Curated annotation (Swiss-Prot):
Belongs to the VapB family. NCBIfam families: TA_anti_VapB. It comes from Shigella flexneri. GO terms for molecular function: DNA binding. This is Antitoxin VapB. The keyword Flavoprotein does not apply. Antitoxin component of a type II toxin-antitoxin (TA) system. Upon expression in E.coli neutralizes the effect of cognate toxin VapC. The VapB/VapC complex probably regulates transcription of its own promoter.
Amino acid sequence: METTVFLSNRSQAVRLPKAVALPENVKRVEVIAVGRTRIITPAGETWDEWFDGHSVSTDFMDNREQPGMQERESF
């Protein structure tokens, strides 16, 4: 979804369309910069949804190929 960026009191602002608006109770956000990408999340909740979400499926990396054990000198 595309939207507009504009200046408000010499700061950049982003107009969020209704379809992607934050909940009304969100008053502060965190902005994470990854290259030219910006990720906006409610302040203090950046990882909450990730950890509260579904875990990986039972077959996740079931057929993971690993090299054999290495023999190393002990310290």
